[in-house]
Amino acid sequence: GDYSSFIKKFKNIDVPEGDFVSTDGKFLGKHKGIINYTIGQRKGLGIALGKPAYVVKKNIPENQVVIGDESDLYTSSLDACDVNLIPFDTLEKPIEITAKTRYSQSEQNAVLSYKGDGIYHVEFEKPQRAVTKGQAVVFYDGDIVVGGGTII
């Protein structure tokens, strides 16, 4: 089985069709339920635009899957909540770390800072592909995990 089948079966929820839209909001077609798509997905979209198209965002309140170019998948920063920092209670000033937003990804140079209200900011040295809200970000100092949080 797949993720969407599991959710439909065990959460007993309806997964309504919605709209594919471009990054500027133009209607591109209908999708088969927002949970069937992941950020960075290219295959199986069921729409032809004459060029490679990727899922770059999911607008859940509007039930829209936003489609764009591969370049639209890259970001140089992220914010995280529910952060747990292992070696210290609070972050007094920005620190240099490495970070991962995907299990198979190599560690990426970044600066971690505290924004306030429980929100931390990660600024990457190089733009990162398909950073996804709701997924984990893990912070490292060399080979040692120094913390992590949820991408928002």
Language model: regions and residue ranges:
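Nucleotide-activated chemistry modules centered on ATP-dependent adenylation/adenylyltransferase
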Residues: 1-145, 150-152
